[in-house]
């Protein structure tokens, strides 16, 4: 085979005959590549945006819910039961209670008294914490037996996770400030070295009467199941001790314009913004209106008036008030009128509000006759002594009291010897008439509860459980534990978000890598294509 060469001269400016001239269709194809590239980039950008949206939506919705369900499944297992220890440091002694706590995310804590061998884990030591006012260095040793008792009933591995609460009440309130501070400081500084329980300074303190009332209100309604979402009805409570009387009830009417104080907004839910467990409570303590302080008021009135006839004592009971001798007459109706006159402070101006407690104290415009009220302590002891404990009937109760007060004191003493009064000692029998008049007057004249149309009852136990404000305190403060659980939930959600963002960026990098690879591949193809079109034959042939 022979090669045929064609050689001719040509100007440098003359187009070579072997140079390929682009046709119009080829020109269009040459400039179509950038447009295709833009389309590819647009497509990739759209895909990226869709990926971003599909990544963010689960973070704010379904994924978050899945995380919450996952955490709840851990939180609400039987193996996640926590423990709580609380000491009720009263005036006569300190009682320790151990509770089991099962947190439920978003709602109330399921709380129960710890039971061991069919008995509640409860222990009391005497005397009261306030008796250490002049020897505060001994308070740690005083409480140590209680703490050892609690530690014996809590799994060892959970001792460090179990909070210890020590709340002191009336006895400690009466001490001088220096003695109060010394006792509290010794407990805060000394307990951490003698117990494995978790001790926090903020959980060792003196609580005021209003909060004692709130804790009682919480305990009563919790035991009765009144915090269930479908149950809107809450009960109120009146707790009369020896020195004071406490009252607490819900102000459910949002239109209530009362601004006289003693109103507290509490939230028992694990999230402050959760309105399901948020309540507005009126709670206060009236010092001087306990049964023993009331007796002092009555006795002082007899001495001041020079009246030696004691209508509030059984007939024939003669006694000394200081150096003044009074003689029991057992006149119940006279007694009731005299005691009623002691309610309120006559030195204070009359109450300008339509509703007032104890005749002088401005109160919310809530008709307590329509509120289901539970009476504790002295209300139970006094009414039950006359066979009227439980559902309260004014006429039946006063009839029984009247019969008792008219008895001769010698006959009452003989009945005591025959065990006719199993729930009272001899001193109590002498004051029964007065205390019946006092609790009645405070209820009807002090708190305006109607004598016939009302929902009041005296109780010692609710659903077989003795009411203790300590239960309410533990329930209220258990939300601190729930906040810790929420932190776990937030960490899980944060971890999920980080995972989602990481996944998004991985996808984005892959998309960009594919785009870059396609661009490089397209450029290479384009250059090769142009080369082939402009150089149809090897250079050495163009000679």
Swiss-Prot record:
- Does the keyword Transmembrane helix belong to this entry? yes
Task: Specify the species.
Answer: Caenorhabditis elegans
The name on file for this protein is Nucleoside-triphosphatase ntp-1
What's in the keyword line of the UniProt record? Answer: Golgi apparatus, Hydrolase, Membrane, Transmembrane, Transmembrane helix
For this protein's source organism, the top of the classification is: Eukaryota, Metazoa, Ecdysozoa, Nematoda, Chromadorea
Q: Where in the cell is it found?
A: Golgi apparatus membrane
Q: Does the keyword Kinase apply?
A: no
Write out the GO biological process terms: ATP metabolic process; CTP metabolic process; GDP metabolic process; GTP metabolic process; UDP catabolic process; UDP metabolic process
Q: What positions does UniProt annotate as the active site of this protein?
A: 212 (proton acceptor)
* Swiss-Prot/TrEMBL catalytic activity: a ribonucleoside 5'-triphosphate + H2O = a ribonucleoside 5'-diphosphate + phosphate + H(+)
MF GO annotations: ATP hydrolysis activity; CTPase activity; GDP phosphatase activity; GTPase activity; ribonucleoside triphosphate phosphatase activity; UDP phosphatase activity
């Amino acid at each position: 085979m022979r090669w045929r060469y064609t050689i001719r001269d040509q100007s440098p400016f003359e187009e070579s005959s072997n140079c390929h001239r682009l046709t119009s269709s080829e020109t269009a194809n040459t400039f179509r590549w950038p447009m295709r590239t833009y389309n590819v980039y647009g497509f990739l950008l759209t895909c990226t945006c869709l990926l971003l949206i599909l990544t963010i939506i689960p973070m704010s919705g379904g994924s978050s819910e899945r995380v919450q369900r996952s955490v709840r499944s851990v939180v609400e297992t039987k193996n996640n039961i926590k423990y709580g220890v609380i000491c009720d440091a009263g005036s006569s002694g300190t009682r320790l209670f151990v509770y089991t706590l099962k947190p439920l995310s978003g709602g109330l804590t399921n709380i129960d008294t710890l039971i061991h061998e069919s008995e509640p884990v409860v222990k009391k030591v005497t005397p009261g914490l306030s008796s250490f006012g002049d020897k505060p260095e001994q308070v740690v040793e005083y409480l140590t037996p209680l703490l050892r008792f609690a530690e014996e009933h809590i799994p060892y591995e959970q001792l460090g996770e179990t909070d210890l609460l020590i709340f002191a009440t009336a006895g400690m309130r009466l001490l001088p400030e220096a003695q109060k501070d010394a006792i509290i400081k010794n407990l805060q500084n000394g307990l951490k070295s003698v117990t494995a329980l978790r001790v926090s300074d903020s959980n060792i303190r003196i609580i005021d009467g209003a909060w004692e009332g709130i804790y009682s209100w919480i305990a009563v309604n919790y035991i009765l199941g009144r915090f269930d979402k479908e149950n809107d009805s809450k009960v109120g409570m009146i707790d009369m001790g020896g020195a004071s009387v406490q009252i607490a009830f819900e102000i459910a009417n949002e239109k209530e314009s009362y601004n006289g104080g003693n109103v507290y907004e509490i939230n028992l839910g694990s999230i402050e913004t959760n309105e399901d467990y948020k309540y507005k409570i009126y709670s206060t303590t009236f010092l001087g209106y306990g049964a023993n302080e009331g007796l002092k008021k009555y006795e002082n009135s007899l001495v001041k008036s020079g009246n030696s006839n004691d209508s509030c004592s059984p007939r024939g009971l003669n006694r000394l008030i200081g150096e003044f001798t009074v003689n029991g007459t057992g006149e119940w109706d006279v007694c009731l009128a005299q005691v009623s006159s002691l309610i309120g402070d006559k030195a204070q101006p009359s109450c300008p509000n339509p509703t007032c407690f104890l005749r002088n104290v401005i109160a919310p415009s809530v008709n307590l006759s329509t509120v289901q009220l539970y009476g504790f302590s002295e209300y139970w002891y006094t009414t039950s002594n006359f066979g009227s404990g439980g559902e309260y009937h004014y006429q039946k109760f006063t009839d029984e009291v009247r019969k008792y007060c008219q008895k001769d004191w010698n006959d009452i003493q003989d009945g005591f010897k025959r065990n006719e009064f199993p729930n009272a000692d001899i001193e109590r029998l002498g004051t029964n008439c007065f205390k019946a008049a006092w609790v009645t007057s405070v209820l009807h004249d002090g708190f305006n509860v109607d004598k016939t149309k009302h929902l009041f009852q005296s109780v010692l136990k609710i659903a077989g459980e003795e009411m203790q404000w300590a239960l309410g305190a533990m329930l209220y403060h258990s939300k601190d534990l729930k906040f810790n659980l929420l932190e776990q939930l937030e960490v899980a959600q944060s971890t999920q978000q980080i995972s989602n963002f990481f996944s998004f960026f991985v996808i984005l990098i892959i998309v960009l890598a594919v785009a870059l690879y396609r661009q490089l591949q397209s450029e290479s193809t384009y250059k090769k294509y142009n080369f082939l079109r402009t150089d149809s034959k090897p250079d050495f042939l163009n000679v």
